[in-house]
Amino acid sequence: MEKTPAETTAVSAGNVPRDSIPCITNVSADTRGRTRPSRPATVPQRRPARIGHFRRRSASLSFLDWPDDSVTEGVRTTSASVAASAARFDEIRRRRQSINDEMKERTLEDALAVELVNETFRCSVTSDARKDLQKLVRRVSGTVLRLSWPNGWFFTYCDLLRVGYFGHLNIKGLEKTFLCCDKFLLPVGTVSRCEAIGRPPLPVLIGEGGRVYVYSPVVESLYLVSRSGFRGFVQEGLRNYAPLREELGYVRFETGGDVGREFMLARDLLALWRLCMKREGSIFSWRDGNEALTTVVLNGSQTYEDPAHGNWLKETCSLNVLQVFVVRAVPVESQQRLDISILVNESGAVFGVHPDTRQAHFLARGLLGFFRVGFLRFCNNYCFARDCFTHPESVAPAYRATGCPRELFCRRLRKKKGLFARR
């Protein structure tokens, strides 16, 4: 194949054919910022190389510092602007490095916290859980973990066996004092708010099966806060600790909020009775978690006419109770929805009546706390007072625990049914 005159001229000049030259542009700049003169008209101008060569060339030269546009335009760069630009880039580099270091530190802390939580859970479900937990707590005593709720609350590993926190209680026999048939109950730390003043920390205990409890020193009772072990406790926080929900929770009304607020402001049974006469048949709704609950206010005559009124007085150990309203379609366990009547006694305590058994169950210490905590305690009251299983008559029926925390695996229940009897 014969060559064209242009290719003959290029080869004779000692140049390589233009299609194989990986050049990027025909204009180059010298170190002083001036543009070189173009080639003579007799030499044909080279066009950019093929796209494949261009990509390889640009990739191989990506590490080079190409001159700014000001250089190509013939503008001189002063030493002051260079220094300012260098200082600016140094500051950006330092900030980026500090952010990266902080992110790495947080990631490391989170990873260590997750590993510690998992190790605590593993120790709580071993065959020798009490001894394994004691060793772990003494090794990591003072370590702090952040809880998901409430905001600003922390869990701190602490060896309460050596501190003597429980004083007169026999800490080695706490499971016999408060629980039904658990083999051990060991304190592993406390929960508190870092800036709280005058609020005593709440001890956290782990029982058989990894279940987590919180001890309330005010009423000397244990509250079951996590059935899924220590990992569930850290993830859920104290959402299942009803006294704290009553104190720190919030009320959300959907409709008829003015009616609900009037009930929260009522001070005694007489004020509630007058409010029922005034708001007879009124409907308002509020949210309990993700559920919107519709509430119907009863009239004054219905507050005392229920045949079970005398039984409610005995079950709640009250001098007087008032049936104020009915909450419709409340979701309970086993995917049931019930219409629950709400009772209030002379001290302001709130109770819910199961529609099937007509028994009263304690819900909250007041109507404000009831709208905050909702039906968390309804048929789910795992609050264990001292000797509540050995002497159940010491606790009023409405305040008694729903049952053993082991539920169907309760050793006393299985022994009573003869499940352990030899055939």
From Swiss-Prot:
Annotated localization: Virion tegument
Assigned keywords, A-Z: Virion, Virion tegument
One Gene Ontology cellular component: viral tegument
InterPro entries with a match to the protein in the record: US22-like (IPR003360)
Polar residues composition-biased segments: 1-12
Region (Disordered): 1-46
Main location: virion
Family (UniProt): Belongs to the herpesviridae US22 family.
Name of the protein in its database record: Tegument protein UL43
Name of the gene this protein is made from: UL43
